[in-house]
């Protein structure tokens, strides 16, 4: 009997030791911190271009990791870009071709695969579609575009309005999750998603005042007349002078506009229902009106300065001077919102450092697409032209990625899901269409053989009136077809014409290049399962939807 009792005692001691061992055992797969801003142009990150703003915290990732100079998107518009990132598929296969079409919720997203593989997952900030992101254990997300001031968040258990500035709040939520909700026995996938610097570019009040006093260098193509391109560039509604709104965008008091009576040029534009509309004071007050009295008092100081300047000087300005005024107003607010993003990225990176998390955490900084900062006289995105087609991409992974390296390889947001899955040693679904960036991250560049990428934009006729188009882009050339109500081709020599000012499609000197690019474009369309039949399918869906609206 004593022997039997002794055996039981030994058994329970062994079990207890095993239990303790299991409790303290850690999963050593890498954590992933995915940081994405909305409409953050690569020109507004100082590691890419330091003429407009200094971004020391975001630059840390370039200094301590890899910077991609030819990163680009598959469809330069918010929700479709995010759907591509989540699914690893082009818009025509994941179904999210534009901001208005529903996302196919049967699609598998990479956070779902991470959760299934034992990762703890969380998402804070702007998703832009749906109110219940799949595959995340914890979330607070903005409804749709969300608001800059005192924003509402949709949560897993309840919705809430949080007082403050959205960029700070998203960071507070992220750091609070790290402090109070992280399971240290599991690796984490954190989706840290900023609203800024999306239109209408409302800065925090102190940044609003600071940046209003700054002046910024103009792009060389600010006064582009689109003379050597087709109809798409000429008909787009993205021009600073003729389409940027006085009240909502430039933040002139509606009362000032009313007092002045007539302000030229009159801003008229097409909305998502194809209706011709004018700017309305509600577009200003829907943002400003969210502020409480003390917040308004801070904003009013700068708002009064803007309106006083506008009222005094606008009537005597010529069109060139008005264009320059609008450019400065645009840059002051856009860059002020980015300054807040950079400050807050620094807060999160510092938290990782201070809590010994940096060493085993892959940190990614990107944007859902690029953005025009006055190039070609434009704001917004959508086109295959470089400023909207290209996007920033910085990745840090200590002991895996050599610090301070630069890659000019053609990579896309299509590749993110497969990259993260491979890094986490999770099986990659066969229907994902990208390629893992792991060879480029780990110095095995010889294993990377992509020479060109495919692009397809759909949201037309709609806001900004950028025509539907698809194309192929290599390091040297860009071939694009605009379709639906036109059938026009454009070809750009990216080395000789980096600003994409001269369409050489009809130039006989480029005949062999043009023919080769046509063949390669068709090859890419077959590879990625796109076709004219799919074009017609989505056009018919668009027409049916608009018919039902009317």
Which role fits each region the language model picked out?
Residues 2, 7, 17-483, 487-489, ...:
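Formylglycine-dependent sulfatase
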